[in-house]
Amino acid sequence: MQNFRDYYALLGIPQSADQAAIKAAFRKLARQCHPDLNPGDRQAEERFKQISEAYEILSDPDRRAEYQRFSRYWQQQGAASVGSDDDYGDFPDFDIFVDELLGRRTVERSPRRSARRSAATSSALSRDLERSLEVDPKTALQGGSAQLQLEDGRLLEVDIPAGIQAGEYLRLRGQGIKGGDLLLRVQLQASNFQVQGSDVIYTLNVSPAMAVLGGQVTVPTLDGPVQMKLPASLRSGQRLRLAGKGYSKPSGDRGDQIVVIQLQLPTRLSPEERQLYEQLRSLEQSR
């Protein structure tokens, strides 16, 4: 089968990998090829889609088992083994199989195909519902809850585990269609904190006087405000680092917060400020 995808190879894990290993492998690869970190890179975008698909299937025990049965079937050149109920002849294309496995489409099967597999697969998968869930970076790091309004009017309160990454899925049992599951793909909300891998980017507006002289300032972080000493002679775009104030890593450690300096020129001046700027200009011109 030409378009078959080996999900274990995509994630770089053995077929015996447990759920923790699958999750860790996905997190590592997702940070490397996330579209936000590779703007305009089509290869990275396609790679991210593939590893997300691999994680979506391998992280679910039922889907993983179905995928492995499908793999064995086609490795045997489409011949169902004696005494086996598995017959995947209705799926000549791997993408069609994945679409049904993820509930994207329903494939009409021959009535002679396995009744056990047909009933179990189409019944279970056709009822799952997939939606996106936006979570602010602070809640994603520390854990908490988020609300989601569904099309049918239901308002769900979703528990967010601490350290969840963009692209990961949360499964709500029984909240899909006709008792199926609701799969929520986590997306980080746009905010003053931009998560890039395990680092967090924050832009700090700095006055001309503070940029020239430096000094103590209060900087917001995901953990709350902290004091930071700015060096003198700062440039707009210069980056400073707050160690350990970034996002969580699979190891449990934290990345850093990168503070990007943005020079903020005053739009209105008091008489005293204008006088001081005029004096400064005179000094500069007399050099």
UniProtKB/Swiss-Prot annotation:
GO terms (BP aspect): chaperone cofactor-dependent protein refolding; DNA replication; protein refolding
Location(s) in or outside the cell: Cytoplasm
Positions of the UniProt region annotated as Disordered: 108-131
SUPFAM superfamilies recorded: Chaperone J-domain, HSP40/DnaJ peptide-binding domain
Domain J: 6-71
Cofactors (names): Zn(2+)
Organism domain of life: Bacteria
Cofactor note: Binds 2 Zn(2+) ions per monomer.
Alphabetical keyword list: Chaperone, Cytoplasm, DNA replication, Metal-binding, Repeat, Stress response, Zinc
Example of a GO MF term: metal ion binding
One Pfam match: DnaJ_C
Residue ranges with Low complexity bias: 117-126
Main location: cytoplasm
GO cellular component term of the entry, any: cytoplasm
InterPro entries assigned to the protein according to its UniProt record, in alphabetical order: DnaJ_C, DnaJ_domain, DnaJ_domain_CS, HSP40/DnaJ_pept-bd, J_dom_sf
Family: Belongs to the DnaJ family.
Function: Participates actively in the response to hyperosmotic and heat shock by preventing the aggregation of stress-denatured proteins and by disaggregating proteins, also in an autonomous, DnaK-independent fashion. Unfolded proteins bind initially to DnaJ; upon interaction with the DnaJ-bound protein, DnaK hydrolyzes its bound ATP, resulting in the formation of a stable complex. GrpE releases ADP from DnaK; ATP binding to DnaK triggers the release of the substrate protein, thus completing the reaction cycle.
Domain remark text: The J domain is necessary and sufficient to stimulate DnaK ATPase activity. Zinc center 1 plays an important role in the autonomous, DnaK-independent chaperone activity of DnaJ. Zinc center 2 is essential for interaction with DnaK and for DnaJ activity.
PANTHER family for this protein: DNAJ HOMOLOG 1, MITOCHONDRIAL-RELATED (PTHR43096:SF52)
Subunit and interaction comment: Homodimer.
Protein name: Chaperone protein DnaJ
